[in-house]
C-alpha cells in the first residue's frame, strides 16, 4: 500500500462520512409551518396560564362549549371545566415532543408529552409525573379558541 493510495482511501472515507452525516442532519430537522407555529404558540400560552391560574386568559380563550377530560378520566364542561384548568400549585409543566395535526384552516389538534410536578394535596398524592396532553383549537370569528383539552397519565407512580 502506497502513501498515495492510503491518503486517497482515507479522504474518500472521510468525504463519505461527511455526506452521510449531512443527510442525516438534514432529514431530522423540520421547520414547523406558520400554522403549526401558531398552534404551538397558543398551547404554550395555555401552559403559562395554567401555571398562573390566569382566569382572564381562560375567559378570553376558551370556547363557549369548552370541555375537559381530567387526569381522573372525568369529563367536565362549562364553568366547571374552566375552573379545573388552572392550577396555582403547579410547580412544573414542561412540555416536549409537541405535534400539530391541522383540521383544515380553522382547527388544530396539539398533542405533547410533559413532565408535571405539583405539591401533593393533604388527602391525596401528587399527580402522575409524566402526562400526555391533547388540545383542540378552533378559529372562531378570527380568534383561536380552546374547545377541548385532555390530560392522560403515561406513567403512574414515577415521582
PLM features per residue range, with description:
Residues 27-159:
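A beta-strand edge to alpha-helix "cap/lid" segment located at domain peripheries
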Amino acid at each position: 500500500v502506497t502513501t498515495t493510495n492510503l491518503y486517497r482511501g482515507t479522504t474518500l472515507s472521510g468525504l463519505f462520512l461527511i455526506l452521510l452525516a449531512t443527510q442525516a442532519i438534514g432529514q431530522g430537522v423540520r421547520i414547523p409551518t406558520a400554522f403549526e407555529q401558531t398552534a404551538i404558540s397558543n398551547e404554550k400560552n395555555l401552559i403559562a396560564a395554567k401555571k398562573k391560574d390566569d382566569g382572564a386568559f381562560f375567559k378570553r380563550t376558551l370556547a363557549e362549549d369548552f370541555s375537559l377530560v381530567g387526569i381522573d378520566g372525568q369529563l367536565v364542561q362549562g364553568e366547571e371545566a374552566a375552573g379545573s384548568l388552572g392550577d396555582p400549585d403547579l410547580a412544573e409543566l414542561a412540555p416536549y415532543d409537541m405535534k400539530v395535526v391541522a383540521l383544515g384552516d380553522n382547527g388544530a389538534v396539539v398533542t405533547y408529552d410533559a413532565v408535571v410536578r405539583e405539591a401533593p394535596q393533604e388527602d391525596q398524592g401528587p399527580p402522575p409525573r409524566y402526562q400526555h396532553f391533547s388540545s383542540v383549537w378552533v378559529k372562531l370569528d378570527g380568534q383561536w379558541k380552546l374547545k377541548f383539552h385532555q390530560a392522560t397519565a403515561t406513567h403512574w407512580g414515577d415521582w
